[in-house]
Amino acid sequence: MNDTFDFIEGVKPKPKDHLEILPVSVMEIGPMGKQGVRGDTDHNKQSSRSGYSPFPYEIAETCAALFLRDAKLTVDPFAGWGERGDAMKRHNKEYRGFDLSPEAIENASKKYEVHNTLADSRTVDVPSHDGLLTCPPYWSLEKYAGDNGLDRCKEWETFISEYDHVLSRFASMAESGATYCIMTGDWRDDGTYYDLTFRTELIMHKLGFIPFDKVVVSRLGISKVKIMLPQAKRLGYTVKVHEMLTVFKKL
């Protein structure tokens, strides 16, 4: 009888509230190859900045299954390579992504059958929505196809102003109670610390959103910190091996 019971237990469908990724406030990201996007990444030879894309499966899955599970329409102003759209599609959620990079649009279509719109989120018609899932460009850390992206801004404050403009346009079309999931990172370059996470929080507060949850996105297990450790010790700061997913709610 125990064997029969075990067999039945083994074939039972997963409950509706089953989560593939454990919902904890620190999520360790597994290795991700970049074939078809930028080739393989060797973290022994490159800075940790190279690991900022593609978007982590664990985070996309958590947002789709947990934070945005009740959203009727989720938008994405920086749709990227298609990972977020793929997660929403797995959960049968309506998703509309916009991106300026023809390369990213093509990759999303071919690899994930996610059909994002080639458009500039600074000017595109934004639909009414109750969810947003995105990861903005990290200013000039990576250069994308196309000449008009935010990565082409020559000054940090110009980038922040353009980023603010995009979020403001989308927030103006967000329904009351809308959920916004935004992943950001901080970094150093030429002795300057760039605090994109904090700047995002300031923008969202101004737009009438409040924090709902935060998840530390840890890349410690896949980052080879030894290449950056000597400089960090010498200059007295930490090696950045994490990003932050911040979940906001519109009042």
Model feature map: region roles:
Residues 1-251:
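Class I S-adenosyl-L-methionine-dependent methyltransferase catalytic core
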